C-alpha cells in the first residue's frame, strides 16, 4: 500500500461527463494506460493476462477524453459503461491510430474487445520516413515533426510525492493526476498521424506503409498464437547439460588442480600457465585474452574442455533458462519488432524478436543447436513445417541484374528458368573455380564484405585472393556491375529503394581520402572535413537492397498466408515455421507466388516432430 502524501499538486482535470458518439469521424486516435508490472523483465503481460488496462484515452479532431477504470488511487468511472462505449468506438469504420500499436492492440484484445477498420501505427510510419533515427517514442517524434513533446511535469511531481515511478507505476495514482497527460498522448498521436501522412507522401513510402499495415493483423495473431515448448524436456536437457559441463570442468581440475571459472580470463590464464601454454595479451591493459575462436581451435585437450564447457554453459543459461523463464502454460509469446523502433528492430525491414529473442536460438552448432531447437514443438496432431525461400539472396541479385540487362547474367537466368538451378554451382562453373570458393565470394560480395575479410574467409594468401577475385569478376561480371551501379546510385541520390518500395537511406558522410574516419551527418562532416566529402557506407548498398527486398518478400508472403487463415509461429532469417496438417503444398505455392521476380521463386520445405529435427 502506498502512502498518500500530505500535499499534492492542484489539478483542474475532471473525467468526461458523457460518452460521445464518434461515428461521424474518419480517424480516431487511441492511447491506453496500463498496469504492466513485468514489462521490463518479461515483456508485455497482455497475452498472459499479467496486468490490465487502467484507463482509455481517445482523441478526434475536436475532442479528446480520458476514461479511468482501474486506477489504484481511485477516481475511476463505471468499468462496464466505459468498455461498452469503447467497444462502440472500436466498431466504427474509422481508421484507428496508435503509437506502438502492437502494445495497445494486444491489451485491447486481451480485454475481450474487437477492433473494426484499419489500424495504423505512427511509430511504423516514423520508421519508414526515417529508419536511421535514434528514438521513435511519441515524445521524440512529436517534438521533431509537430513541435509538441510530452509534458510529464505534473505527473512526475505527483509520482515523486507518492514515492512511485511516474511511468511504470502510474496506475497507482488517482486518475485526476493522469487524465491530462493521457489525453495529451492521444491528441499528440492524432496530430503526429496528420503530419506523418504528409511525410510519407513526400518520401513516397505510402505503398510500403500499406504493406506494413496489412501485415499488422497477422503479427497480432502470431503474438497470441505463440509457439509451444516442451518444458519437461527443457528441464531434462538443462540437467543433462549441467552434468556435461561439470564433467568438462572435472577433467580440467584432475589435470591441473584448478577450479577454472570459464568466463574469467584470469582464471583461464592459470590453466594455461600450469600447462605451459602461450596465450595473447590485450594491447591496452596487457590482461589475458581468450577469444572464442582461439579456445575452440586450440589443439590442447584441456583447452578444448574449457571451450566445450563454455558452449554448454551458454546453451543452458542463455537459451534454456530463457525458454523456461518466458514459457507460460507451455507456450512462448515472443514480442515481434516489425520495424526499427525503441524496442529493437532493423533498418532493413527484417523482423527482430524480444522476450525472448528467438533469432538467437542457435542454428550453427551442429550438436547443441538441434537439441535446443527440439524444445519447440508444433500444435497437437500437426508436424513442424519449415518453409524458406531457396537461395533468396542470389535470386534477388539475378533479378536486379536481369532488370538492368547486365553482361553475363543471361547464363544464370536461363539456368533458373530451366529448373532446379544452384547459383553457387553455376557461378563456380562460369568462373572455373571450386563451388566452395564461389559461394564464399558470392555471399561476401552480397553482404558488403571488405577484401581483407573475404580473403580471411577464403583462407588463402593475399596474392591467391587477388587472383581469385580477378578471375571471378572477369568471368562473372554482372555481380560487380550490379554492386557498382547500386553503390553509385546510393552515392548520387543518398538512397535506394527495395523491391516493394522500402527506402534505404545513406545519411552519413565521410572525407574522400582513404583512412579511418567517423561518419557524420552532412553539416557536421562539412565543418570537420570541408567540401571534399562523400556518403559513408555505400559499399553496403547492395546488401541493404537485398536484405530489404528479402524482408519485403517474406512480409508479402505472410500477408497472403494470413488471408488464407495460416498463421506462422516464428519468422527467423529466411524461414517461416508453421504447424502443418495436409497444407504444406498450399503454403509453398502461396509463398512462391507472393512476389514476382525475373527468376522463378522456389520455397524449400522440411517437416518433423519438432524444430530440432530440421536441418
Functional labels for PLM-detected ranges:
Residues 36-39, 102-113, 126-129, 268-276, ...:
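Short active-site loop/helix that positions an aromatic residue
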Residues 1-72, 133, 143-368, 377, ...:
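Conserved "right-hand" nucleotidyltransferase catalytic core of DNA-directed polymerases
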Residues 457, 577-581:
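Short hydrophobic/aromatic beta-strand micro-patches
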Residues 217, 224, 277-280, 296, ...:
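Conserved catalytic core of nucleic-acid polymerases
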Residues 61-96, 227:
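Nucleic-acid-processing active sites and adjacent nucleic-acid-binding tracks
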Residues 114-131, 137-140, 420-424:
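Conserved beta-strand -> loop -> alpha-helix junction used to position metal-binding or nucleic-acid-contacting
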Residues 29, 94-101, 386:
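Acidic beta-strand-to-loop metal/phosphate-binding motif
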